[in-house]
Amino acid sequence: DVVKVVVAVGVVSCFDLEASIWAGFAAAFGHCYPVFAGFRGGKAVATMFGFLLSTSIFTFQSAWYLIVPFAVFLVVLYAGKMVSLSSMCAALTSSIYITVMQLHISVEIVAASWLLTILVIYRHRANIVKIKNGTENKISWL
């Protein structure tokens, strides 16, 4: 899941950096709604990680675009023990960080980032209900 986004962003970034962001979003969207699996796919968390990894390398050339959301993921996971909540917080953090750092450069990059965050949160809507009801699964190994 991570690799498909890294490859998409990496290849397209050779030609157009802004288009590489959309290639990453398209790969994540395709992961969530695969044609050959009846449009039933994942929750875009692994592909979001691939998006952040690949854009950190190819588009932004700064590891901070990956480190900041990953640090938030780890802190929220340690505090709340819920992977779903941690994933959504990391997605929000990534878009906020990209907005702060890139808005003056490219609205397209910011828009693609927010669309990916919305996709991640939308795919976790059942988990949001469980969190509200106090029935979301928690990890026990941390």
Show the residue positions of the predicted features.
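Loop-to-transmembrane alpha-helix initiation sites
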Residues: 65-69, 83-90, 104-116
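Glycine-rich phosphate/pyrophosphate-binding loop and the adjoining helix
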Residues: 103-112, 120-130
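Interhelical loop and helix-boundary elements at the membrane-water interface
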Residues: 2-6, 31-47, 76-90, 123-142
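Alpha-helical transmembrane segments and immediately membrane-proximal extracytoplasmic
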Residues: 2-3, 14-19, 56-60, 100-110, ...
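Membrane-embedded alpha-helical segments of multi-pass transporters/permeases
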Residues: 9, 36, 95, 99, ...
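Interfacial segments of multi-pass membrane proteins
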Residues: 12-16, 26, 30, 45-80, ...
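Multi-pass membrane catalytic core of lipid/isoprenoid biosynthesis enzymes
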Residues: 1-13, 23, 68
